[in-house]
Amino acid sequence: AIPFCLWQTKDNNHRISLMANSIKHLPHHNNCIQVESDEDLRRSVTEHSIDAVVLRYSLDNLNIAEDLPSNVMVIMWSHNFIKRTELSRLAKDRRITCIVCVGNEQLQMYRDHQAFYKSVAIYNGYPINHFIRTQSCHISPFENRSNEVTFLGNLVDYKGFHLLAKAWKKILEAVPDAHLNVIGGGKLYDRNQKLGIWGIAEESFENMFMPYLLGDDGRLLPSVTFHGVMGNEKAAILNRTKVGVPNPSGISETFCIAALEMQLYGAIISTISYGGFKDTVYKTGDLYETPDRLAESVVKQLKKTDNDYSGVLDFVRLFDFSTVTKKWIELFDTLQQTGNIDSILKPKPTKEYRLAEWNRKFKRIIPFGSLLPSSMFYKSIFHRISSLLHKYACRKHNYPRI
């Protein structure tokens, strides 16, 4: 959506072209270019005298970037955490002018890596202002909501639903009338995925979380509803949700649209203090440090009586498309004037990332310092080991066969 918004922006300083493998469904526009192959891209860049190309980061696109004309600035737009080896390649590649992260926390993780010097943060976007104009007046008052908890996301292990499933019976002990809505499924992004016997998620993952949600009779707890993959109809569920739980593992979350969406519908958030959640969750949310605090966090949130909805709306405007596209235009202005991003101010290190900032400065002054691992590398390894231990604990218990 952001490329489309940029394409429609009335900007006298830049000619913004939208490249796509099919343009027949796009509005007629002189700056809409059909690109069906790598060769099409290279030819179009030359024919249309394009100065800079924005590519969504992937190894394939990195290889494509290396074949573009040497005078073309390449901006890599990274929606996911980048592996350290790939980050080093980006840092050394002179063709790559800029790496755009979709959140400040993602950028902070690269603070003591060489790639930090060519990286900036521009938030991902959402039609916030449109939602506020058309939907905010229909949002149910928080005090009128029952104890509904909602998970919104893909049912795969790295999205952490098994952690919420494991915590659910403990939540019920404290709040007996709580109800869990699960929106999403194992086929959210892969329609060909083979599902388990419950038809909910891939078999091995389904077998990991389902035992936590079954009663003594082997049937699904009445307090749990799997809604499957939903479109606009999910609005009715979100509008009665009290606590939203997006990806309680935090793995892969550089931004999290689901957190924004649930807050727009009036829910307060309970999830781990990691990655994009630190950017996208308002102060009414509860960000815990370790997954074993999930049940405690949800119970605490369910007992709240106010969601400060007006404060939420002020907070989320930061992520509206209009604000985000302005940041992109500012980046284009800087690159046009200087050819690099040296003049763009980087966010100051947070308390958590001061060690990374010290490490960055230390590595600059010692011989071969750039070869030392970044603190991001160690933190990522620790976080993944922690998640694997929790997954192992889920599988260790002897559950009834399902």
Tell me the role of every PLM-derived stretch.
Residues 55-60:
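Short His-centered aromatic/hydrophobic patch
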Residues 85-90, 95-121, 126-133, 328:
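A short, active-site helix/loop in glycosyltransferases that binds the activated sugar's phosphate group
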Residues 100, 133, 139-172, 180-183:
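Conserved donor-binding/catalytic core segment of Leloir-type glycosyltransferases
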Residues 193-229:
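Nucleotide-activated donor-binding/catalytic signature segment of Leloir-type glycosyltransferases, i.e.
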Residues 223, 239-254:
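Acidic donor-binding loop of glycosyltransferase active sites
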Residues 264-271:
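Short hydrophobic beta-strand element within catalytic cores of glycosyltransferases
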Residues 317-402:
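C-terminal amphipathic helix plus adjacent low-complexity
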